[in-house]
């Protein structure tokens, strides 16, 4: 999944102005063990990555893994914070906001996605991107994630997914179409699917029925 995350972000930023001297600031929300945060921090065009998670246990794992890489130990390169997005201080200026805010495999676990997303928006710099991944609420996704992944194959623990919390791509589009300051025409989405023996693969049109990436740009 991680290589697809990076390629999707690159595709979103393809037409953004390139400023060689300007490096990117990331905010990774619900970072878990730091898989994406670490990989983003190693990119040559990255200035810094702030990764947050409300669960202390997973951050201990992330911190331990970070210490294995001298690059990640450079001051300001990768910072883990044990906090929720609701408790993270709001940026006081454009410079304090982030070029890319990521939310991977989190939205399908929250009770109220609308208010939750509202807490993310101020952290995105004007001209920056909010990039997330989640699961569409369809019978196909229920069969794949609840029945096959949990009950049949045992890939994830039972009870990991609550189908009623899944969020459809058109619901996210509708949310940002009404949200002031966001470019609804910039929305990008891409379906992805786990193929046993081959890993995660892009599935064009898969955003309508299964796992998908979703991104939207904040207006300048």
Task: Describe the predicted segments one by one.
Residues 129-154:
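Conserved class I S-adenosyl-L-methionine
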Residues 153-171:
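Acceptor-substrate binding/catalytic loop of class I
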Residues 100-111:
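A short SAM/SAH-binding and catalytic strip from SAM-dependent methyltransferases
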Residues 27, 32-87:
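Class I SAM-dependent methyltransferase SAM/SAH-binding core
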Residues 86-101:
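A short acidic, Gly/Pro-enriched loop at the edge of an enzyme's catalytic core
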Residues 114-126:
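A short glycine-rich, Lys/Arg-flanked "PGG" loop and its adjoining helix->strand segment in the class I
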Residues 75, 181-220:
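A C-terminal cap/extension of S-adenosyl-L-methionine-dependent methyltransferases
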Residues 2-24, 39:
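Conserved alpha-helix/loop element of class I SAM-dependent methyltransferases that forms part
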